[in-house]
């Protein structure tokens, strides 16, 4: 019996294997959330703002990994004291395609402070984030969502738009992973949800939040400094 066809088949198989291997090595195995976003943009019927307060922390790397694995981008409202102490994590936030924003320096009740003290909290955070490589923030979230005319005025003087939230995940209050997923399911186009960098239950919820948004053709967007609403990344 002739062995010609068998030899030809083996040679073809080896050549195909080489081609497949070459292609695999030429194509990145992972994408950042920012790189993956254009492929999904056509399916987006709206955008929501995922936000995480109080970082960067020891939980930040795991959170960034979860977000990028699930093709999500988010706004990270960093405390200035932690940005100053962890500049590499601020740079990691930016590298992962996240937006970095101001959440005061020490997380005080700003409405109980003088105008000069409020200014110091905001200004020092702007400097800490910029110095860490996070750019100059355009968004500001007052701690506890507490604000008044003075807080808004000082933030505006620094070129910041104040952002509160439409949906509170209650992760700061011990909400379960299921409860956090249900909270995210209430988001509608343009709305913003409050979550926290340090919450283990929130970290566990990220894949299911991504699935829920995709099922409703909603995408994670940036928060517009002009309107304070979530919009397509620009």
Question: What name fits each language-model region?
Answer:
Residues 48-52, 74-78, 99-104, 138-142, ...:
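Structural recognition of the beta-strand scaffold that forms the well-ordered cores
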Residues 146-187, 218-229:
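His/Asp/Glu-enriched short active-site or ligand-binding loop at hydrolase and phosphoryl-transfer sites
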Residues 1-38:
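Secretory targeting and sorting signals
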Residues 54-61, 84, 112-119, 145-146, ...:
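Soluble non-cytosolic domains of exported or imported proteins
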Residues 38-113, 117-118, 124, 128, ...:
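Active-site beta->alpha N-cap acidic-glycine motif
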Residues 62-65, 88, 92, 120, ...:
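Alpha-helical scaffolding segments of alpha/beta enzyme cores, especially the outer helices
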Residues 55, 79-81, 105, 143-145, ...:
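Active-site beta-loop-alpha junctions enriched in small/polar residues
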Residues 40-44, 66, 70, 83-85, ...:
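C-terminal domain-boundary segment and adjacent tail
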């Amino acid at each position: 019996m002739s062995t010609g066809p068998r030899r030809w088949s083996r040679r073809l198989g080896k050549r195909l294997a080489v081609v497949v291997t070459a292609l695999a090595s030429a194509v990145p195995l992972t994408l950042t959330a920012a790189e993956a976003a254009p492929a999904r943009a056509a399916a987006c019927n709206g955008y929501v703002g995922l936000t995480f307060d109080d970082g960067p922390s020891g939980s930040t790397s795991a959170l960034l990994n979860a977000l990028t694995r699930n093709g999500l981008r988010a706004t990270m409202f960093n405390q200035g004291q932690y940005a100053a102490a962890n500049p590499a994590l601020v740079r990691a936030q930016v590298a992962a395609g996240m937006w970095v924003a101001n959440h005061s320096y020490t997380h005080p009740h700003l409405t109980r402070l003088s105008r000069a003290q409020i200014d110091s909290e905001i200004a020092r955070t702007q400097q800490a984030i910029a110095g860490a490589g996070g750019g100059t923030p355009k968004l500001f979230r007052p701690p506890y969502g507490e604000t008044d005319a003075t807080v808004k005025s000082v933030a505006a003087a620094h070129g910041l738009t104040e952002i509160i939230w439409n949906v509170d995940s209650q992760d700061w209050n011990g909400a379960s992973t299921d409860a956090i997923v249900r909270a995210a399911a209430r988001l509608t186009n343009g709305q913003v949800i409050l979550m926290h960098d340090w919450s283990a239950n929130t970290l566990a919820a990220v894949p299911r939040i991504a699935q829920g948004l995709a099922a409703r053709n909603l995408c994670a967007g940036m928060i517009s400094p002009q309107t304070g609403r979530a919009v397509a990344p620009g």
